[in-house]
Amino acid sequence: MNSKDESPSVAVERALAMLEAVAHEPEGLSNAEISRKLQIPKSSASYILRTLETQGYLNRDAASGKYRVGLKILSLSRGALSGIDVREVALPIMRHLVEKTSLTCHLAILDGPEAVYIEKVEPPGFIRMDTWVGRRMRVHATSVGKALVAYIPQERREKIVSERAMEKRTPKTITTLPRLLKELEKVRTQGYAVDDEENNLGARCVGAPVFNQQGAIEASVGLSGTIGQVNAQTMPRIVEALKDAARHISMQLGYRAPHRRVGA
């Protein structure tokens, strides 16, 4: 059967299969490789590939003859990802995190100089955190707040963070700009933030950043418990679980961490 005489459904199925195959090969695929991989006649594959190239969905390298994903695909993916609700993505991961750690989990976003809780998952039991969805907290005294403000552009950070805004919530609260800036540098280095009884005495919290497709900070996810629950012995396990959850949420939002060069 001539490729032009294929039924529309078969042609569409083959075109989508080709796009997926090329998308999974960073070095690209040639017509022959695609035909062999998908068991499609070379004449049919050639016709569909030319059409996809003409429409901007694929790019063909003249030297190697290999096809790679085109910018049209990127624009479509951005449109799809822009409609993703971070709460919807994060909630099942947060529930799993709570089951794993038996701690309260919060999802927060930055709104002006404050961190706002937009989701909360609690474990079963008698210990309850005095927090709720919609509660606003100054960024300097919470782990989710520090995780948010640590990754915004420096100019915006300096506007948000000022000593006037650093209310002393407990004797352990950071209330000076130099100390907070040093703390935020530590957050960026280790990839997570800690609230060590800085917002409420007897409570210790850990927060990690969530990034979007553009690599910008989108939200932060945090785990909260008593100082007995979050201590020197349990902290490494809690941090590992939290960072893993934040990474999974970020990936579902389209984020891809940059590859580190060997020796860099």
Language-model segments: residues:
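Short amphipathic alpha-helical signal-transduction/dimerization elements
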Residues: A23, G145, V149, P153, ...
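Short, solvent-exposed recognition segments
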Residues: F126-N199
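Short, acidic, Ser/Thr-enriched surface-loop or helix-capping motifs
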Residues: A62, L110, F211-Q213
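Extended hydrophobic
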Residues: T176-A245, G263-A264
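All-alpha effector-binding/dimerization core of bacterial HTH-type transcriptional repressors
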Residues: R78-F126, Y151-Q154, L180-E183
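N-terminal helix-turn-helix
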Residues: M1-E88, S250-Y255
